[in-house]
Amino acid sequence: MSLQREIGTFVAAVLNYFDTAVQQAAVVGTPYLALGKPPDIFDYTGMIRISGKKKGVVYFTAPKGMLSVMLMRMQETDMSDANLRDLVGEVANTLSGNARKDFGRNFIISTPSVVTGTSTTIGHSPDTRPIVVPIDWRTYHAN
């Protein structure tokens, strides 16, 4: 599978998630390789480790305000830290699960882990290509 098609898999997963879960379209910016400069990390980050033929991490990182509005769009009234953590992990898990449909059963995904704080760094192994898919939704930006 070409790199362009691999990226397209994640772009489609992002667009589908927002269309389905919050029933409001997101806009995906131009994906880019995050070489030399780490990507922006926001208040909450959900991470899924990938093993099998592909190795790496799929993550979704977003500001608290964006996640809160997403919960409201889902008719959720609980804006607790625990629920924000659940949501960011769910998004990362859904994006990974959708990608697994394209990549096949050798795209093995872990359960989500969640970290908070903008000082978090997302590490990657030297033999992976860190690709960032910028997401704009309403007035918010995420990766």
Residue map of PLM features:
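N-terminal auxiliary interaction/assembly segments of multi-subunit proteins
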Residues: 1-143
